[in-house]
Design a protein with these regions (language model features):
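N-terminal small-domain helix-loop-helix segment of the aminotransferase-like
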Residues: 5, 10-101, 108, 284-287, ...
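Generic structural signal for small/hydrophobic residues in well-ordered secondary structure
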Residues: 24, 28, 36, 53, ...
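Helix C-cap/helix->beta junction micro-motif
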Residues: 31, 137, 198-199, 313, ...
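Conserved PLP-anchoring active-site segment centered on the Schiff-base-forming lysine
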Residues: 112-134
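Active-site phosphate-binding strand-loop segment of PLP-dependent enzymes
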Residues: 142, 146-215
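PLP-dependent enzyme catalytic core of the Aspartate aminotransferase-like
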Residues: 161-162, 344-353, 358-394
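Conserved core segment of the aminotransferase class I/II
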Residues: 225, 229-300, 307-309, 313, ...
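Conserved glycine-rich beta-strand-loop-beta hairpin in the small C-terminal domain of fold type I
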Residues: 282, 298-307, 317-330
Length: 394
């Protein structure tokens, strides 16, 4: 604007530009490349759940503002899911809150629980909205880096303990972990739980990939560990489990006090969202366990296809224990800069990926790592692998 010298964007958000996902998806569209960057499936979820959404629309359920905490049918289904899967009992009226996807749940939790100047310990690399939401809350993020070890990315518990200070308010967890695919073990989570109780910390845990774990990995909600239910906000989502990312239906489960606090922030964000889809997700959560087992087996096969193809193309591959992302090391290809590599990859191979460095405060830690998504059709993954194998011949 003419004559204005003060920056329009406030200083809390000044470090955040357009997300890398928007940039790389636009690059995929412009070049006609296969988009293995952003984590969304290229097929829809179960037909019966789509039909449930259609019925809700036609019957006028959710077409007007739904209740602020979410429709009772969905809150009840979420509580039933937590009890059936993990033995966690939540009151659907006081301890469950429906949100506009997990991203709003993260934002509302941090805005509600973090005071300006509070420190938030987060595992890096991290989903990019974590940093922005901490900044919007006026908090200070304190990253603890997951580092490559024995083919995976490992948490150093001593480093985590050292990161906690008198100013620490909460630990922000993500397991299964995006982008590395690490699934925190029961022993690791027990150590984190002991630290949280010893230092009187809250835990906000993003568990949207809870059903996407492979081989012998086990997803353990930290809220299920002794002494943790009363200090944990657990975040879940329908998008990843049921392949309806556009519906934006997420939720939190927590004590009445924590749920009320998060709702106080959430009501001034979207207030409500996704009315008809809430009824459909309630039905999805009641699908037989055979659905999630089938999804897990399907994704594990896709993980193996992409991982083996990337290894054959010359990448160093960190095979994930969970999520639907593979992190690769580009140094065996003679590359060291993930940003430059990913920006050139569409022209070189017709494939789009994400540079992991965007998920780090310590950018140098993530510089040689690149993330690929395998939540695509098998034929798409095979074509991507065939294209990537040409890299060594270009």
């Amino acid at each position: 604007m003419a004559g204005m010298t003060r920056p329009l964007l406030n200083r809390r958000l000044a470090e955040f530009g357009t997300t890398i996902f928007a940039e790389m998806s636009a690059l995929a569209a412009r070049t006609g490349s296969i988009n293995l960057g952003q984590g969304f499936p290229d097929t829809d979820g179960p037909e019966e759940i789509r039909e449930a959404a259609v019925r809700a629309l036609r019957e006028g359920r959710g077409n007007q503002y739904p209740p602020g905490p979410g429709v009772p049918e969905l809150r009840t289904a979420i509580a039933e899911h937590q009890l059936r899967r993990y033995g966690l009992a939540y009151d659907p009226d006081a301890e469950v809150l429906v949100t506009a996807g997990a991203t709003e749940a993260i934002a509302a939790a941090l805005l509600a629980l973090v005071e300006p100047g509070d420190e938030v310990v987060a595992l890096e690399p991290y989903y990019d909205s974590y940093a922005a939401c901490i900044a919007m809350a006026g908090g200070t993020r304190v990253p603890v880096t997951l580092r490559p070890h024995a083919g995976a990315f490992a948490l150093d518990l001593d480093e985590l303990k050292a990161a906690v200070t008198e100013r620490t308010r909460l630990i922000l967890l993500n397991t299964p972990h995006n982008p590395t695919g690490t699934v925190l073990s029961r022993a690791e989570l027990t150590a984190i739980a002991e630290l949280a109780q010893e230092r009187d910390l809250l835990v906000v845990t993003d568990e949207v990939y809870e059903h996407l774990v492979f081989d012998d990995a086990e997803h353990v909600p930290i809220a299920s560990l002794p002494g943790m239910r009363e200090r944990t906000v657990t975040i879940g989502s329908a998008g990843k489990t049921y392949s309806f990312t556009g519906w934006k239906v997420g939720w939190i489960t927590a004590t009445p006090e924590l749920t009320s606090a998060v709702r106080s922030a959430k009501q001034f964000l979207t207030y409500v969202a996704s009315g008809p889809f809430q009824y459909a997700v309630a039905e999805a959560l009641r699908l037989p366990d055979a659905y999630t087992e089938g999804l897990r087996a399907e994704l594990q096969a896709k993980r193996d296809l992409l991982s083996e193809g990337l290894a054959a193309a010359g990448f160093g591959v960190h095979r994930p224990a969970g999520t639907y992302f593979v992190t690769t090391d580009i140094r065996p290809l003679g590359e060291t800069d993930g940003f430059a590599f990913c920006r050139a990859l569409p022209e070189r191979a017709g494939v789009v990926a994400i540079p992991n460095a965007v998920f780090y405060d310590h950018r140098e830690e993530g510089a040689p790592f690149v993330r690929f998504a395998f939540c695509k059709r098998v034929d798409v993954l095979q074509e991507a692998v065939d294209r990537l194998k040409r890299l060594g011949r270009v």
